[in-house]
Structure formats: structure tokens, C-alpha cells
């Protein structure tokens, strides 16, 4: 079982998904995957140790791949997705949960409001030294959590990241390094 749970917001649009199925494009060529694979290589994260999921199940019926998932407006839909996310975490018992972007971080915050209280209102990405948390309780699971900028917008947003004495890409690499060393020992 993978030890790292990587949480995005959603998969994409129906059109994008259908183009992948038709062989017109490869998902790994999109900015999200290109930038994520580069970061994970820098952080020495083995993809075989990772399970990739999304906070929201389903595809967008819109043309835009970015921004808040349209289903966010439906409280019942959000709650069902939170239940499913919690179920996945309880089954996997990951040592590390990595969120991609503010919306995924906000969904994880909703499962552990006491331990991730600083992540409320998307502060996991805004405030210095708040993107990495150890010993986060989610149900019966205790994990380290790292909130990363969404890979598709990574280079536009990295300037705001700060952790310890590091900024930008170095800050996110330091958070990942601390999280990995925390459960490697």
C-alpha cells in the first residue's frame, strides 16, 4: 500500500477526459503532471509510494479546468466527497498527505479542523510556516500533511511560499523533505 496520499481538487473537464480516452492527448503532458513530476523528482519522492486521488469525484461540465470545482456549491455533494475522502484515508493510513492547491487543502482542513486550524480560509498556502503539519488526526489516522501550490499554477504562485528560512520552490522542497524524514525514521 502506498504511504503517500496525493490529493488534487478534481480530474478536469469532460472534454479533456474524452480527448485522453480518444488518444488525442496524454494526461502526463499537461502542466499539472509535468510540474508535479519535476517537483517529486527534486524531492526524491518515488511515484510507486504515492496514491493519487481528488477531493471531488467526477468531471467538470464546463470548459474551464481551473478554479473552484462547480460542485462546491452543493453542500450535500461536498459532504459526500468529504465522506469518501475520509474513507480513502482510513483505508490507506498514509504517513504523508500532500495537497495540491488551495481547494484540496481546504477540503483536508474540513476533515481535521483542530489539527489544521491554520489551514482555514486557504491559509495553508498564504501564511509562512503553515504549509507543513505533523501528527494530523483524521479519524483514526495520524499523518503529516504538506500543502503545495497547485502544479498547474506553480510558478505563478511560488513567490508567496515561505517555510523556515526558505522561500519559493526551496520552501516547498524543505516542507516535503521534513515530512519525508519525519516518517522515514
Regions found by a protein language model. Give the residues of each.
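Active-site and ligand/interface coordination hotspots across diverse enzymes
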Residues: 1-31, 38, 134-141, 181-185
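A structural signal for short, well-ordered beta-strand segments and their strand-loop junctions
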Residues: 4-6, 46-54, 96-101, 147
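Short, solvent-exposed loop/turn segments at secondary-structure junctions
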Residues: 10-14, 56-60, 102-106, 150-154
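Surface-exposed cleft-lining segments at the edges of enzyme active sites
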Residues: 14-28, 59-78
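Short, surface-exposed acidic-centric catalytic microdomains
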Residues: 30-72
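Short, conserved loop/helix-junction motifs that constitute active-site signature segments
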Residues: 44, 90-92, 138-141
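C-terminal capping/extension of enzyme domains
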Residues: 65-78, 82-83, 110-185
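Proline-aspartate-enriched helix->loop->beta-strand connector
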Residues: 85-105
